[in-house]
Design a protein with these regions (language model features):
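Charged alpha-helical initiation segments
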Residues: 1-22
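Residue-level recognition of short, well-ordered coil/turn positions
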Residues: 22-23, 73
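Short, charge-rich amphipathic alpha-helical segments embedded
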Residues: 23, 34-49
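Solenoid-repeat scaffolds in large eukaryotic assemblies
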Residues: 25-27
Length: 103
């Protein structure tokens, strides 16, 4: 993917977040990269835009980001225990997120 300058900057932050072990920030930033690309990159191929919007892994990422950011009284998508006691699953999700845009 040929990223716009804005998306490239966000990707750099996502990589820095990942390297620092900030898994939640990585997931959020990777989705932000995709959001910027969809909104501003006029050179994206139509089929690729469709994949970004409806592809299984991209839908997973968008839904995961939304669950992390938006509160739901009935469920807790993340707790302090997830971050401080057992963050292995978050690390796996962050890695999966980054792989969507750098491979």
């Amino acid at each position: 993917m040929n990223l716009t300058p804005h998306a490239t900057a966000l990707l750099g932050e996502a990589v820095n977040s990942f390297c620092g072990g900030n898994w939640v920030a990585t997931i959020i930033l990777v989705q932000a990269v995709l959001d910027v690309e969809l909104a501003t990159n006029e050179f994206l191929d139509g089929a690729y835009v469709n994949e970004l919007r409806t592809g299984k892994n991209f839908v997973w990422l968008r839904n995961r980001r939304n669950r992390l950011l938006h509160a739901d009284i009935n469920t807790h998508s993340i707790t302090d225990a997830d971050i401080f006691d057992d963050d292995r699953n978050l690390e796996i999700e962050a890695q999966k997120s980054l792989k969507l845009i750098i491979t």
